[in-house]
Structure formats: C-alpha cells, structure tokens
C-alpha cells in the first residue's frame, strides 16, 4: 500500500503554472525555454490565449503539440484581460500548488523547484521569492522573514500592507479553489484584492531569499498593455472590493494601506 501511495504521489503534478498571453508572439519561444529548462519536472503549464490577434495562438498550439505532457493551451472566447485569463487557468489546474507567470518575463531555471521544496518543508500555503525589475533597476522581496511561519493578525496585516506580486509566489491550489478566490477581469491592479483574499485564508507562509523572477516591463504584454483598462471605475471597483475585506478579520489598518496603494 505504501509503495502504491508513493507511486501515486510521484505521478501528481506538483506545480501548475498559468500564463496569460495577449499578442505576445515574439516572447513565446523565450518563455517556453524558461519553462522547459525548469529543474522541477513535475509541472503542468497552462497557457491562456486571451483573444490574441497575432500568431500567439498558433505558436502555442505548435508548442503544445510538441510537448503535450507539459503544455496545454486554452483559447479564450473573448479578451478577458490577464485576470480573467488566469481564472481560466485556475479552473483547469490540477497541481498541489499553482504559480503565475507573464509571457514576456523571465524566470530562473530553479524557481519552481526552490519554491516547491520550501513549501514542502512544512506544508506552507504560500511561498514568495525576490524579483528584479529591469525598468526601475530594483529588486525586492515582499514576504520578509518577519512575516513567515504561522500567521497571526499582525503578520497578516504586514502581508496585506506589502502584498507584492502574484508572479513571484506559489499558492496551495486548494486554498484558492476551496474558497472560490478569483481574479478580477479587465481591470488594473488585478493582483491586489486577489492576494489580499489569499492572505486572509492561508495559515502560514515562507520565502526563498533569492531573485528568481525578472520583471521585463514590455509595453505590449498582457499585463502591461492597458487595452482601455486604465479607467477610474476599474480602480474604484478594486477599492470597494478591498474595503469589504476589512470585515473578514482584524486587519483594518493594513486594508487602509492597500486602498491607498490602489489609489
């Protein structure tokens, strides 16, 4: 029986990686190289073609045909924005953990192995790593040592106040699915209330103090091209959603900070 359990565990996907793609044909091969070179092999990669008008969808299909055991593609019936595209990927994901990547960015080949191994040490619900932003020439780690381990209200507040980016983290997939946590469609700041909702539901967190994610800031990417999304009502919608979260637990001051960030 123990042998069978070990065998089944070996077959399980450890990390699902969801990648929204919008008119990113010139970045797809580089993105694929980053993923194929990952040292963690028990991964599934879910590309979501978010209504691209270039050859992105065709290129993704070609790669999925070449590497069907790792890659799959979802073709959205409409332009949902990076948040909506990620939601389609979340629904399809089967891994123990889930991570997100933007097609035009770069990840270290050891990123998902290091994040997963850290998560497996003590069953952490969320693990973060440091990132480097090419445009600003700055690096940062959102989840510092002061807010790792088992979470209390003080640590939760610190996470919410400096929540960072979804792409530098992996999350226990069951936390997202069991609590029906989703990302807002077609708005800017789509990460913000998503990450705050997760912070309110996870029990513990950890970090890997290495720069494993390179943020490229390409203007035409799915996450950076506003495609008419930069509107006042978008920010207002996220602001109101964050305001409602303050009733979930004792993190009111952190929620106020997050709302200021949104503005």
Describe the role of every protein-language-model region.
Residues 2-240, 244-249:
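Nucleotide-sugar donor-binding/catalytic module of glycosyltransferases
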Residues 256-263:
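Non-catalytic, C-terminal membrane-associated alpha-helical segments of glycosyltransferases
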